[in-house]
Amino acid sequence: YTSEDVWNAMSSLAEKDLTDQLGIAPGPANGFTLDMIECFEKFGDVMDWAMIILNPFEPWPGQHVLPAAQKNGVKILTRVVDYGGVLHDDVKPGHHFRDGDHRTYRPEGWVDHACEKIEKIRPIADKHGLSMIQLACQWNLAHGPVESVVPTLIQEAGPDAKPIEDKLDDLAALPGENLLSAEEVETIRKIGDNTGCMALKG
């Protein structure tokens, strides 16, 4: 997606009304920050959207593409705002993941560490009357070019798991205005800071 030939071809699709939106969604892994910044700088004038991984517990490295997106007029759609389901608040320490669940390949103890962080940011959610997933969505949307969030919806195993319908209702009740102060956004970022957790790609 940093190839001029690719973007010339993509632009021709838009010119022929075969699409009304152009964008990129690198992945499924994280860390394509350098390539994305280069792409925004070279082709931002023909790009509408880009999808990145961003959430309160994974601010890095996605946060570094945001200034380039803002500068070049690229709208950002953020996925995995729920941090592997933990921010839906029904994945707790000792949680049993179903066989084949991709989250079982994460480092041991990731749920425990995430739940510790949840308790540190819960007072901010409580102050504003937000659930944890609503707080995560508001945090993402507080960043300039972010215009949409895409949580993952998984029916978790176990008797205490929230039904997917309840998770959808929770998301539908997200306030239209952002309730977080700049100080609260930064406090959450510091609590969730994951700087250097992977090698950057590109």
Predicted features by range, described:
Residues V6-M10, D35-C39, V65, K117, ...:
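A general structural detector for well-ordered alpha-helical segments in enzyme core domains, enriched
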Residues E4-N8, W60-Q63, E119, Q134:
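Residue-level marker for well-ordered alpha-helical positions
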Residues Y1-P56:
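Glycine/proline-rich, positively charged
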Residues Y1, L34-M36, P61-Q63, L87-V91:
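Short, well-ordered secondary-structure micro-motifs
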Residues L54-Q63, A125-S131:
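Active-site glycine- and acidic-residue-rich loops that bind
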Residues S11, P61-N72:
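Histidine/acidic residue-rich metal-binding segments in metalloenzymes
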Residues P67-G202:
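Structured C-terminal cap/extension of enzyme domains
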Residues F32, W60, P159:
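Glycine/Thr-rich phosphate-binding loops of Rossmann-like dinucleotide-binding domains
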